[in-house]
C-alpha cells in the first residue's frame, strides 16, 4: 500500500481531481443527512461515474458510496483498467465489489475514521493508494459529531 499523499511529489493531479469528485459526492450525502462517503470511478483519468452513500436517505443498508458509484456506472465491458476513488476506506461489502469487478486500483481519501479492508485488498493484488486527505477526515468528524447515532448504527459500531 502506498501513501502518495506523504511522498515528496504528493498524489498525481488526476488522483487529486478525481478525489475532489468523490469528496463533492460525500458532501452532498452529508447535506442530505446521510453518511458522507463519496466515490468516483475513472478510466485513464476520465470520470466514468460517481456516487455517494444513500443508506440513510433510501433506507437501504447496502447503498454504500462505492456501490452507488458502481450502480451509476451501469454495465461496462470491463472494469480491469479502472480506478475507484473513495473518501473512506472501503468496508468488506465494497472491498468485495472491487474484487468481483476486478478493479485493479483503489485510491482512498482516509482510513483514520474507519480502517476498512485495505490489507485484504492488497493481499488480493489490488493497488491501494492512501491519500490521508485532511478534508475527508474533517468531513467524517463533522458527521460523527452531528449524527452520532447514525454513525454507531453503521460502520462506527463495528
Question: How does the language model describe each region?
Answer:
Residues 1-29, 96-158:
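Zinc-dependent deaminase
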Residues 37-45:
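Short beta-strand scaffold segments in enzyme catalytic cores
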Residues 77-89:
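Immediate flanking context of iron-sulfur cluster ligation sites
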Residues 54-68:
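A short, polar/charged loop-to-alpha-helix boundary motif
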Residues 22, 26-29, 39, 65, ...:
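Small-residue (primarily alanine) positions within well-ordered alpha-helices
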